[in-house]
């Protein structure tokens, strides 16, 4: 389905611009993208829902129409950015993926006005051991040295996002392959494209969010907002299934749905870096849950 998007922006609490795309008509619904994505990454999902909802696709900081991360960036910052979009749009419906699923849950816990939220494979860590977040120091060093490919490898391995075969390949070989792919994209992408190289610095902040909420599952035990938990059946990062099952036990007002054949990136558009993209399979669940017309 081809739809027209209109660009806009709001100002977050600290003065940072938060850009967004808007399409459709009906009740306002905010779709918040995950790591290594931008608002555009959810264009297919937005298009599929645009006949029932006015869909907003914010760019989280550091990409697209939004301003940069600032020192002290935290989960609270992410919630404040979402709050600015919610206030502008009047939205009471929110969907988040992975780390943004955690942002959505925290927003529902701390902000008034979110009536329903859906979270796809929220990236919640059940303990604060640092096993999935202590890669950031190495990542920052590699990025500062201009070794973008190496930094991405560090992130993929640190988050357990790398395919099984990658885990047995030399880091140098993996980094060279990613560097070559980025150079090709740099040559061929239009000037306004949100390329992998532009996206790479944002990856550290996904770890910041996960680390901040690690071991804090009990925070959501009193959440009264209506929640839909979604996950696919394909294997994702090792911490995703335990987090899903723990939230399924703890959340007091929710239901959970397992979508056969989907993976961690399925809500976003299919691309070279997201071969499992299948927004058409996710949209019907969101439509039913948020109350759109069938």
PLM feature segments, named:
Residues 253-294:
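Catalytic active-site module of serine/aspartate enzymes centered on a nucleophile-bearing elbow/loop
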Residues 91-130:
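Conserved hydrolase catalytic core segment
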Residues 176-215:
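Hydrophobic, aromatic-rich cap/lid helix
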Residues 223, 229-231:
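Short beta-strand/loop motif that positions the catalytic acidic residue
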Residues 9-71:
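Conserved HGGG/HGGXW glycine-rich cap/lid loop of the alpha/beta-hydrolase fold
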Residues 36, 60-64, 124, 261-266:
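Alpha/beta-hydrolase active-site loop signature
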Residues 56-95, 99, 273-280:
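Active-site loop/oxyanion-hole signature of alpha/beta-hydrolase fold enzymes
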Residues 236-243:
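Conserved alpha/beta-hydrolase "acid-adjacent" motif
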């Amino acid at each position: 389905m081809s739809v027209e998007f209109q660009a806009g922006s709001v100002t977050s609490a600290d003065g940072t611009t938060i850009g967004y795309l808007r399409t459709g008509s009906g009740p306002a619904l905010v779709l918040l993208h995950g790591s290594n994505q931008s608002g555009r990454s959810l264009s297919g999902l937005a298009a599929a829902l645009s006949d029932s909802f006015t869909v907003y696709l914010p760019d989280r900081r550091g990409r697209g129409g939004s301003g940069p991360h600032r020192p002290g960036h935290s989960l609270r910052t992410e919630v404040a950015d979402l709050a600015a979009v919610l206030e502008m749009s009047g939205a009471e419906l929110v969907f988040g993926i992975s780390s943004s699923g955690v942002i959505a849950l925290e927003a529902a816990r701390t902000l008034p006005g979110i009536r329903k939220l859906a979270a796809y494979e929220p990236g919640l860590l059940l303990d604060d051991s640092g096993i999935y977040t202590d890669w950031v120091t190495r990542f920052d060093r590699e990025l500062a040295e201009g070794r973008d490919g190496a930094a991405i490898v560090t992130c993929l391995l640190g988050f357990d996002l790398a395919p099984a075969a990658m885990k047995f390949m030399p880091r140098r070989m993996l980094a060279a392959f990613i560097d070559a792919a980025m150079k090709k994209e740099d040559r061929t992408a239009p000037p306004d494209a949100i390329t992998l190289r532009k996206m790479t610095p944002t990856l550290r902040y996904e770890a910041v969010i996960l680390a901040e909420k690690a071991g804090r599952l009990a925070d959501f035990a009193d959440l009264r907002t209506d929640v839909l938990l979604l996950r696919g059946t394909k294997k994702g990062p090792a911490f995703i299934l335990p987090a899903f099952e723990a939230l399924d036990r703890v959340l007091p007002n929710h239901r959970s749905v397992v979508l056969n054949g989907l993976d961690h990136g399925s809500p976003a558009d299919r691309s070279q870096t997201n071969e499992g993209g299948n927004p058409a399979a996710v949209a019907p669940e969101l439509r039913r849950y948020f109350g759109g017309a069938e």
